[in-house]
């Protein structure tokens, strides 16, 4: 029967579409990468989601985040993403969690509820904890490495974390995961050498923070503010969505 996912079903088949419909995916980090992960998955027929992020849409998100418009500035990212996903597929189930994932909040999540976990967060501590919790629960996880300070979207690769090269974040993650006995981890990374951002305090969030009132993570509290584009994190997010769809449909 013709439906909104018919074009996808022509490639994946009816059985795969049923698997996607019955799957629950947790996406941690609904930003430049995570937003496009959600977009790709909901348009592919995944039936249930948990969205995790405590941030609000900021004016500086408009250059790259699919949820960011002038009208959504100041709104919680998970709420905006949920509304968008339900407009695409009203039948999907989307739960939102307005929290910043850290070891202290890990107990709030039951990873055995998920069929797949997507790590699209920025901090190493959070990323490592996500990997440990997902693997402990036996749930597949894919982790995004650095997408900031990059200009060439064609340089993204899918690989095991221990086979990555050229990505500073991946290097830090390799060390941290090796210390904790993690043997493997599927990641999306770019082998492009990062571009050093221009030091211009007149356009720096560090000196002109315009985060929405009540935002928990101010730019002035961050060590570095990376440069970004519309066409790099979006590609990383869609590659991740493709990997999740492929793995779930073959499970």
Predicted regions and their residues:
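N-terminal charged helix/coil linker that caps or initiates catalytic domains
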Residues: 1-26
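Glycine-rich phosphate/adenylate-binding loop
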Residues: 2, 109-116, 126, 136, ...
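Conserved N-terminal Rossmann-fold NAD(P)-binding element of oxidoreductases
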Residues: 27-29, 52
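Hydrophobic/small residue at the entry helix of a nucleotide-binding pocket
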Residues: 33-34
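Glycine-rich phosphate-binding loop and adjoining beta1-alpha1-beta2 segment
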Residues: 46, 51-89
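Conserved SAM/SAH-binding loop
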Residues: 98-106
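Short, well-ordered coil/turn residues at beta-beta hairpins
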Residues: 120-121, 144
